A protein has these predicted regions:
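Basic, nucleic-acid-interacting segments
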Residues: 2-262, 278-280
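Intrinsic low-complexity, disordered N-terminal segments enriched in polar/charged/small residues
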Residues: 273-277
């Protein structure tokens, strides 16, 4: 059993997790293309996934129902209105130039994950489409793109910053994995990318009332999480602070966030409401 609070050299880690779960639907979130792992590159791509002009997305009802199941399993509030947003940014593996996601009206809000020794609050869980996959190791001088993953339905589960140690974070991830596999909404296969995790981390004095500067660690796994406590102090206590760190020895990327909420609103990020009332 993990300790509820872990203070290291007078500092208290504060951790919030964003878990991306690929849902077990037959087709993608907004297109009729099949949702299946391991097929030949670009063999499961629809016109919608390619972002061609004139195509219109239709929401996958099965993905919506699976999101609702997760919300019920975590005693969360279920949205009565389905509203989606466009998150605009520029990646080679995102042909549309934006990702369809939920910002203002997520399908799930205010859930609870019970670890036995403490409860971790879920801020929200929202539906969004996955991006394609860029591969840089196939050819010496060129990168290639596989759009099979483009449009695959994701449920992004965002916790509140209630986690206070790496071992608590691992317990939380194991509990999320247990829930999604028991509900049969995802296979939770981390090696295939069915369950991916980003961590928002900071440190504070135990008697402080405000959190410290937040850093985001992308694409971590349980083995890295187990050593986060000591690495966290090394990263954040170094000075001066950097906006971006590439940590080659642990294979992840750290980005300091200087915005007041979960969503980055930098030069390449803006939001436009995208409404859908179709559940077919």
């Amino acid at each position: 059993m993990a300790q509820n609070d872990t203070v290291i050299n007078g500092w208290q880690p504060v951790i919030g997790l964003e878990v991306h779960v690929q849902l077990l639907t037959n087709t993608k979130l907004f297109s009729p293309a099949k949702n299946k792992f391991g097929e030949d590159a670009n063999s499961l791509v629809d016109l919608i996934d390619m972002g061609l002009p004139g195509v219109l997305p239709v929401l996958n009802e099965g993905a919506m129902n699976q999101g609702i199941k997760f919300g019920l399993a975590t005693s969360a509030k279920i949205a009565e209105t389905m509203i989606f947003d466009r998150k605009n940014y520029f990646y080679p593996d995102l042909p549309k130039g934006y990702q369809i996601t939920q910002l203002h009206y997520p399908i799930v809000k205010d859930g609870i994950v019970d670890l036995g020794y403490k409860k971790v609050r879920i801020h929200q869980a929202h539906l969004e489409e996955d991006a394609g996959k860029s591969m840089h190791d196939q050819y010496d001088a060129n990168s290639v793109i596989d759009l099979n993953r483009s449009g695959v339905p994701l449920l992004e589960i965002v916790s509140e910053p209630d986690i206070r140690s790496a071992s608590e974070a691992v317990d939380y991830l194991k509990k999320i994995h247990q829930i999604i596999t028991y509900l049969d909404i995802s296979d939770g296969n981390m090696s295939q990318g069915s369950m991916r995790c980003d961590a928002n981390v900071s440190i504070m004095r135990p008697d402080a009332k405000e959190f410290g500067t937040r850093a985001e660690i992308k694409n971590i796994n349980q083995f890295l999480m187990m050593t986060m406590d000591t690495r966290l102090l090394n990263w954040i206590l170094q000075g001066p602070r950097k906006a971006h760190w590439s940590i080659a020895d642990i294979g992840c990327h750290i980005t300091y966030k200087r915005v007041p909420n979960t969503y980055e609103r930098g030069l390449y990020y803006c939001w436009n409401n995208f409404y859908s009332n179709s559940y077919n």
